């Protein structure tokens, strides 16, 4: 499970730890400054949700954890606990995949600590699992630089045209 790689990386990092799935392709130049702007010090975590009002789990192909923030440390402790104490954690949840677990914990913590950055918070998305609603990452500002080739997109070598819900200007999306 990738969550253990996340825990390990966080113990070896300082300031921010960013997770990016291995099936993510950086298609355009991305400067350090542009990358750093995606990680505001005022947020304890950044991630890609599925749009306003969505009841589904986040897209966990890219997220950043502000390791200097105590709330983030609490999140990481709970994220690990849910797996380590499975009988009192993950096995009590409706679904067991990392994105569902991640979303469950974030949603609980946002009640008292709402200072998160959801890259898709203001985005309109179709119903989840259809069209771009099931593939929000490329429809956020992250799509300017990266493509997440999840699922059968790996075989195609690129996300589907039907996944794109916003006007993309980058050359990568024109071909």
Question: What residues fall within each predicted segment?
Answer:
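A conserved donor-nucleotide-binding helix/loop in the catalytic core
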Residues: 1-18, 44-49, 58, 95
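Conserved hydrophobic/aromatic beta-strand scaffold that supports enzyme active sites
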Residues: 5, 62-64, 146
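Conserved nucleotide-sugar donor-binding
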Residues: 14, 58-74
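Hydrophobic/aromatic beta-strand patches that form the interior of the parallel beta-sheet core
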Residues: 18-20, 46, 63, 117
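The conserved acidic donor/metal-binding loop of glycosyltransferases
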Residues: 21-25
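Conserved donor-nucleotide/metal-binding helix-loop-beta segment in metal-dependent transferases, i.e.
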Residues: 26-58
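A recurrent flexible, glycine/aromatic-enriched loop bordering the glycosyltransferase active site
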Residues: 51-64, 90-94
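Catalytic core and acceptor-binding pocket of nucleotide-sugar-dependent glycosyltransferases
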Residues: 67-173
């Amino acid at each position: 499970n990738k969550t253990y790689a996340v825990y390990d990386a966080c113990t070896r990092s300082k300031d921010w730890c960013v997770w990016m799935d291995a099936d993510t392709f950086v298609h355009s130049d991305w400067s350090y400054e542009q990358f750093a702007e995606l990680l505001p010090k005022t947020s304890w975590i950044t991630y890609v949700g599925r749009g306003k009002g969505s009841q589904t789990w986040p897209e966990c192909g890219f997220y950043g954890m502000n390791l200097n923030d105590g709330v983030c440390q609490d999140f990481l402790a709970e994220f690990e606990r849910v797996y380590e104490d499975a009988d009192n954690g993950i096995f009590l949840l409706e679904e067991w995949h990392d994105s569902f677990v991640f979303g469950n914990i974030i949603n609980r913590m946002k009640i008292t600590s709402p200072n998160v950055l959801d890259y898709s918070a203001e985005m309109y998305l179709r119903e989840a699992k259809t069209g771009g609603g099931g593939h929000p990452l490329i429809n956020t500002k992250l799509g300017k630089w990266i493509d997440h080739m999840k699922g059968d997109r790996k075989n195609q070598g690129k996300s589907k045209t039907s996944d794109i819900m916003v006007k993309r200007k980058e050359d990568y999306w024109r071909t």
